């Protein structure tokens, strides 16, 4: 379950309904989608070859079909990050700067964990996401992402249009201070 860390030492938010409510008030869609048990043979592996990635995506396709029907999503892929990924730090450096996309950024965390940061006009906060978390960052929302200390995540990325997923960087710090 996601945890929200706020500025100025405010108490973290951990209860699912409170997390959903907090994020919904800010236009961020959040849900808790259990990864099917028949996928654990793949989610438990650190490294997946392309055929295993496709097999895992197929086991999760009910979610994709729902997003296609309801919101017009056209494609999806699986990103698998772990400490042994070549160029991991360089890759992560693209995401840890404050940016926005002209399309939604939609993620379904199927293993591991990471942190989304959000910068609104008068508020910054972090959302620590874990396995089974679904989050949709609205288009044109300033945010950033980094891996936590475990440096391990498997996430399905859903796209309506790949051209809208290009990051547009802004002059904003990713610090909660």
Swiss-Prot record:
Fe(2+) binds at residues 99, 101, 105, 143. Pfam families: ARD. The record marks 107 as: Important to generate the dianion. GO terms for molecular function: acireductone dioxygenase (Ni2+-requiring) activity; acireductone dioxygenase [iron(II)-requiring] activity; iron ion binding; nickel cation binding. The keyword RNA-binding does not apply. It comes from the Bacteria. Binds 1 Fe(2+) cation per monomer. Binds 1 nickel ion per monomer. Ni(2+) binds at residues 99, 101, 105, 143. One of its GO terms (biological process) is L-methionine salvage from S-adenosylmethionine. Keywords: Amino-acid biosynthesis, Dioxygenase, Iron, Metal-binding, Methionine biosynthesis, Nickel, Oxidoreductase. Signal peptide: none annotated. InterPro entries: ARD, ARD_bac, RmlC-like_jellyroll, RmlC_Cupin_sf. It is an enzyme of class 1 (oxidoreductase). It catalyses: 1,2-dihydroxy-5-(methylsulfanyl)pent-1-en-3-one + O2 = 3-(methylsulfanyl)propanoate + CO + formate + 2 H(+); 1,2-dihydroxy-5-(methylsulfanyl)pent-1-en-3-one + O2 = 4-methylsulfanyl-2-oxobutanoate + formate + 2 H(+). The keyword Nucleus does not apply. Its EC number is 1.13.11.54, 1.13.11.53. Its cofactor is Fe(2+); Ni(2+). Pathway: Amino-acid biosynthesis; L-methionine biosynthesis via salvage pathway; L-methionine from S-methyl-5-thio-alpha-D-ribose 1-phosphate: step 5/6. Catalyzes 2 different reactions between oxygen and the acireductone 1,2-dihydroxy-3-keto-5-methylthiopentene (DHK-MTPene) depending upon the metal bound in the active site. Fe-containing acireductone dioxygenase (Fe-ARD) produces formate and 2-keto-4-methylthiobutyrate (KMTB), the alpha-ketoacid precursor of methionine in the methionine recycle pathway. Ni-containing acireductone dioxygenase (Ni-ARD) produces methylthiopropionate, carbon monoxide and formate, and does not lie on the methionine recycle pathway. Belongs to the acireductone dioxygenase (ARD) family. Monomer. This is Acireductone dioxygenase.
